[in-house]
Amino acid sequence: MRIGHGYDVHRLVAGRKLIVGGVDIPHELGLLGHSDADVLLHAISDAILGALALGDIGKHFPDTDPRYKGADSRALLRHVMELATRKGFHLGNLDATIVAQRPKMAPHIPLMREHIAADLMADPDRVNVKATTTEELGFAGRGEGIAAYAVVLMEEK
């Protein structure tokens, strides 16, 4: 078994959709990035890649490559999971935390878990997503961005 940790952060800006955990969340601001900027799925992808010593999301999907402009992060996560499967691993469990002052993430977490479990070919009871604020401290607390942390346990088949 192997453990991986992932972290990602994206700036909130006008004129972009807010997509977190594969869910389109109504909000006046969205996350800025080369792809759809799904901060949670990027952190999860990095955690899986790290557990398997396969580098990071930037190595596999560089922001200099036009193929990934506006890319669906769910498709990227599925590709990462295919790499894990080819190496003989499946998800043991995932624990992830979204750090956002607003909008509130709690109403969207059940659908996020459903999407993530499907993309990782795992039972939903192996996928945990939670959200917290920073009590209005720092960039997240000021509403300038959203961060996410993820820890995965990958098990050999």
From Swiss-Prot:
Species of provenance: Geobacter sulfurreducens (strain ATCC 51573 / DSM 12127 / PCA)
GO molecular function, one term: 2-C-methyl-D-erythritol 2,4-cyclodiphosphate synthase activity
Note describing how the cofactor binds: Binds 1 divalent metal cation per subunit.
Residues annotated to bind a divalent metal cation: 8, 10, 42
TM regions (residue ranges): none
Record-given protein name: 2-C-methyl-D-erythritol 2,4-cyclodiphosphate synthase
GO biological process: isopentenyl diphosphate biosynthetic process, methylerythritol 4-phosphate pathway; terpenoid biosynthetic process
Keyword flag Lyase: yes
Required cofactor names: a divalent metal cation
InterPro entries membership: MECDP_synthase, MECDP_synthase_CS, MECDP_synthase_sf
First-tier enzyme category under EC: lyase
Site (described: Transition state stabilizer): 34, 133
